Amino acid sequence: MAVLSPEDRAFWEENGYVIIHDAVPRENLAAVVDAIWDFLAVDRTDPESWYKAPISKAGMLEMYPHQALWDNRQHPKVYEAFSEIWGTKELWVSFDRANMNPPARP
């Protein structure tokens, strides 16, 4: 079953990105959020703790091969969306970093 609608495909072609709603289950999202907080070793209820290393100004975290990230990258709906975009089933799953951009300090 196709993940991308004709409108999604046209948006991709025009803008170079597309948003896939509900691409992974909510449990997967919660696992990534928990993994990020654990990696940062900060108190998610204490905003003052959010602004110390290892958070860079760009928000990129050197959190590479974490299972929660792999689970999302390999999720069937994500795979199928990339397969439709690139026109092939022969895809390699790669890993990337996570990002944490806390709001500006009050």
Which residues fall in each region the model found?
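Non-heme Fe(II)-dependent double-stranded beta-helix
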Residues: 1-15, 21-106
